Amino acid sequence: MAQSVPPGDIHTQPGSKIVFNAPYDDKHTYHIKITNAGGRRIGWAIKTTNMKRLGVDPPCGVLDPKENVLMAVSCDTFDATREDINNDRITIEWTNTPDGAAKQFRREWFQGDGMVRRKNLPIEYNL
């Protein structure tokens, strides 16, 4: 029954983008707080547009209502003068968990006919 109700909102801190500052010859890590602002348990997963440069830990999880998680987004070393840095972003996807499901993330929650919501956080690189 959980799949017939759209997933509630999430809040992220920061709310609209992630900024990494030069120099890029050392690994940078930025923390994002994700809060389940809805009234149902959700499963969430992170996707990135640049798997080679951007890492996410943890990459997925489960949040009860009003619960939050601190997630690390890391940017590996790269040459900003020779690589395209214009379209990087991370996308947070979330969906309601099935009623009675254990609090353990399952990829198949995102593959059924239930509604999946998305929030994009663009990555900005200051040179």
From Swiss-Prot:
Cytoplasm in keyword set: yes
Modified residues (N-acetylalanine): A2
InterPro entries, A to Z: Ig-like_fold (IPR013783), MSP_dom (IPR000535), Nematode_MSP (IPR051155), PapD-like_sf (IPR008962)
Tissue/organ expression: Sperm.
Keyword annotations: Acetylation, Cell projection, Cytoplasm, Cytoskeleton
Residue ranges of every copy of the MSP domain listed in the record: 9-126
Keyword Ribonucleoprotein on entry: no
Superkingdom of origin organism: Eukaryota
Location of this chain's protein in the cell: Cell projection, Pseudopodium; Cytoplasm, Cytoskeleton
Pfam families (alphabetical): Motile_Sperm
An example Gene Ontology CC term for this record: cytoskeleton
Function: Central component in molecular interactions underlying sperm crawling. Forms an extensive filament system that extends from sperm villipoda, along the leading edge of the pseudopod.
Full protein name: Major sperm protein 2
